[in-house]
Swiss-Prot record:
GO terms for biological process: positive regulation of cell population proliferation; positive regulation of DNA repair. It comes from Mus musculus (Mouse). The modification Phosphoserine is found at S52. InterPro entries: CCDC117. The gene is Ccdc117. The modification Omega-N-methylarginine is found at R47. This is Coiled-coil domain-containing protein 117. It comes from the Eukaryota. It is found in: Cytoplasm, Cytoskeleton, Spindle; Nucleus. Facilitates DNA repair, cell cycle progression, and cell proliferation through its interaction with CIAO2B. Residues 139-166 form a coiled coil.
Length: 277
């Protein structure tokens, strides 16, 4: 670059001594007078300059963390002592219950497990299952007890109604001796017992009626033999046949009486025609 005759803009052309001096390692800090070279050397680690953005973010994080810590301490100080004791007691009771449940589970299953190996979801599932079992059993018992009470109440009401009911209000069936003997002779005794038992209900009624012998005779009249039936039928057919020729003869007799009159009229007409000719 110098051979071409053009000055390099990155380097100062003046030969001042400031350019050759190294920049200070820690700007704005005064080192103690008796500090050695190894004390002045920078320590290992990444350190950002005050003007760099990395240094600014690091300082911002530290300040935010300090603020949060101070805020928590202030809130703890402002919290009343009674509230602190209550929260500590609740947390202690919860941890004791978890430890006791884990110990009982190890004794019941016979497996030596570390408390730290027990996960929170598994413990919660076990607790929920135990609660469901304890709440489900009483519900079944309560439902069974209610059903039993309802059944007992219904039975008691039926017994009271039957005891209060008077026997005279029920329908009665009076059977005569002849009817009893007839039923025993024709039917089985079990059937009669069932009939009588069915009459104990108020909605059942039985009416027995026997028609008079004049209306319905016991024995039908003997029918005529087939030969007599044929003779009667032939006689019935012959009677209309004899009556029919008599009627035909009566109709033909007037026609025969009118024949000579017709003949006389014809003779008279013929004589008149001859006279005209």
């Amino acid at each position: 670059m110098a051979a071409l005759g053009r000055p390099f803009s990155g380097l100062p052309l003046s030969g001042s001594a400031d350019f050759l001096q190294p920049p200070p390692a820690f700007a704005g800090r005064a080192f103690p007078p008796g500090a050695a070279g190894h004390d002045l050397a920078p320590r290992p680690g990444v350190r950002g300059a005050p003007s760099s953005p990395g240094g600014r973010t690091a300082r911002g994080r530290v300040s935010i963390h300090c603020r949060k810590k101070h805020k928590r301490l202030a809130e703890d100080d402002e919290c009343p002592v009674r509230k602190k004791r209550l929260t500590e007691a609740e947390l202690g009771a919860v941890t004791d219950e978890w430890a006791l449940g884990a110990h009982q589970g190890r004794e019941g299953h016979g497996v030596n497990t570390c408390p730290s190996s027990l996960s929170m979801p598994s413990m919660l599932d076990v607790v929920c299952e135990e609660m469901d079992q304890t709440t489900g059993e009483p519900q079944c018992e309560v439902a069974r007890r209610r059903l039993q009470e309802i059944e007992d109440r219904i039975i008691d009401e039926d017994e009271e109604v039957e005891s209060d009911r008077n026997v005279s209000h029920l329908p009665s069936l009076v059977l005569s001796d002849t009817m009893k003997t007839g039923l025993k002779r024709e039917f089985d005794e079990v059937f009669t017992k069932r009939m009588i038992e069915s009459m104990s209900r108020p909605s059942m009624e039985l009416v027995l009626w026997k028609p008079l012998p004049e209306l319905l005779p016991e024995k039908p009249k003997p029918s005529s033999s087939p030969k007599n039936y044929r003779r009667e039928s032939q006689a019935k057919h012959a009677a209309p046949g004899t009556a029919f020729p008599q009627r035909t003869e009566g109709l033909l007799e007037p026609q025969c009486a009118d024949a000579p009159l017709y003949r006389s009229l014809e003779a008279a007409t013929s004589t008149e025609e001859e006279m005209e000719l």
